[in-house]
Amino acid sequence: MAGGRRGGRRRKKVCYFTSNGITHIDYKDVELLKKFVSERGKILPRRVTGTSAKYQRKLTVAIKRSRQMALLPFVAEEK
């Protein structure tokens, strides 16, 4: 069995922003942005988070803007 998938159907991910009625993603809302950044500091892709394409673009801009303003780190801190 070389790399076959097991199990049934996966649950469809729902966009966090459309389900909560959020229309504007603010770059100063660091707690919200941290949910969409990995522990290494990378922006999580749509297939992981389930966000729609529209909000993924807005989210990416907000995270990059937040990094430029030094609110979010570019990379994770070493332990």
Swiss-Prot record:
Biological processes annotated in GO: translation
Keywords on record: Ribonucleoprotein, Ribosomal protein, RNA-binding, rRNA-binding
GO MF annotation terms: small ribosomal subunit rRNA binding; structural constituent of ribosome
PROSITE patterns: RIBOSOMAL_S18
Gene Ontology cellular component list: cytosolic small ribosomal subunit
InterPro entries linked to this entry: Ribosomal_bS18, Ribosomal_bS18_CS, Ribosomal_bS18_sf
PANTHER family with a match to the protein in the record: 30S RIBOSOMAL PROTEIN S18 (PTHR13479), SMALL RIBOSOMAL SUBUNIT PROTEIN BS18M (PTHR13479:SF40)
Function text: Binds as a heterodimer with protein bS6 to the central domain of the 16S rRNA, where it helps stabilize the platform of the 30S subunit.
Oligomeric form and interacting partners: Part of the 30S ribosomal subunit. Forms a tight heterodimer with protein bS6.
UniProt record similarity statement: Belongs to the bacterial ribosomal protein bS18 family.
The name this protein goes by in its record: Small ribosomal subunit protein bS18
Biological source species: Listeria monocytogenes serovar 1/2a (strain ATCC BAA-679 / EGD-e)
Gene: rpsR
